[in-house]
Amino acid sequence: TLVNTSFYWDNLIHFGMGPKKGPDGVLAITLPMADKRLSGIAAEDIGKCVYGVFKGGVANVGKTYGIAGEHLTGAQMAAALTKALGQTVRYNAVTPEQFRGFGFPGAEDLGNMFQFYAEFEDYFTGARPLDVARRLNPELQDFATFLARNAGRIPLG
């Protein structure tokens, strides 16, 4: 049995992917996703979905589950962050090449990951139907709910 996850929204808290102030003082999130949707999920919901798989017993043996809480563009994520944080957050779209060149540990791997997500958006999001995750975890959070619970934990750079 396989559970295929999505981008962890917790990366905004723990991995330095939260909004950063630009030269004009306005916050922005930077992703190489152009106008493509990114499947995302709260880390705690991954565990709850896996628990749902286990609760299903032998009926779930050998199955593959793709899970996500929501599929959002970078602009939609920025709008949700703006609402949750009470200050403007822009979406800064960069190319995968630019992202890989940022020079932090893992930038190349993340750039490759995001490039795959963007270039194969329909495949990636289609393999993560929201109703499947919600069936496994009836408490599944969408991005707005995640932000309502965690906005104060997101470091603003």
Feature names for model-found ranges:
Residues A93:
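Conserved residues in the N-terminal Rossmann fold of short-chain dehydrogenase/reductase
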Residues N60, P96-G157:
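A hydrophobic C-terminal alpha-helical subdomain
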Residues T1-R90, F99-E108, A151:
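Oxidoreductase cofactor-interface core, primarily capturing Rossmann-like NAD(P)-dependent enzymes
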